[in-house]
């Protein structure tokens, strides 16, 4: 009997937590992509889709079809589409050559990320300052295929 009560209590608490978390992720009740929250643990692939989850850090993979991919860890736990979010360092961003060469790993001190909905997808702008004072800018468009797979 005690086990049944514990299981029921656990299920009720879990359901309550899920409802509370879901309520925190939206500013209003419409289903617009503008109210989607990028959660800690999300992975993004430019020109492709939301394709993986990681438990340990916010992780995004920006690849606009050029010679180098851009891989970022940490910095912010969540960013709302349509708003500017501060990056809080220090954290690493790895620039990984797609040909398998050595990566470049600057330590980001501070900066911002702004994600806006545009015709054809999402515009992602990251402007940051490395610990050595050097400025870093990432400006890419996540195209329709990414947006379609957002959910």
Residue ranges and their predicted role:
Residues 1-22:
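Sec-dependent bacterial lipoprotein signal peptides
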């Amino acid at each position: 009997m005690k086990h049944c009560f514990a299981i029921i209590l656990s299920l009720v608490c879990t359901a309550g937590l899920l409802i509370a978390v879901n309520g925190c992720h939206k500013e209003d009740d419409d289903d617009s992509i503008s109210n989607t929250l990028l959660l800690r643990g999300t992975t993004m692939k430019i020109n492709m889709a939301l394709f993986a989850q990681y438990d340990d850090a916010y992780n995004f993979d920006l690849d606009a079809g050029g010679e180098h991919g851009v891989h970022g860890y940490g910095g912010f736990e969540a960013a709302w589409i349509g708003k500017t979010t501060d990056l809080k360092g220090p954290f690493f961003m790895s620039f990984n050559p797609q040909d398998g060469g050595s990566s470049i790993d600057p330590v980001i001190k501070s900066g911002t990320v702004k994600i806006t909905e545009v015709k054809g997808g999402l515009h992602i702008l990251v402007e940051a300052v490395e610990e050595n004072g050097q400025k870093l800018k990432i400006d890419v468009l996540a195209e329709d295929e990414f947006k379609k797979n957002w959910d």
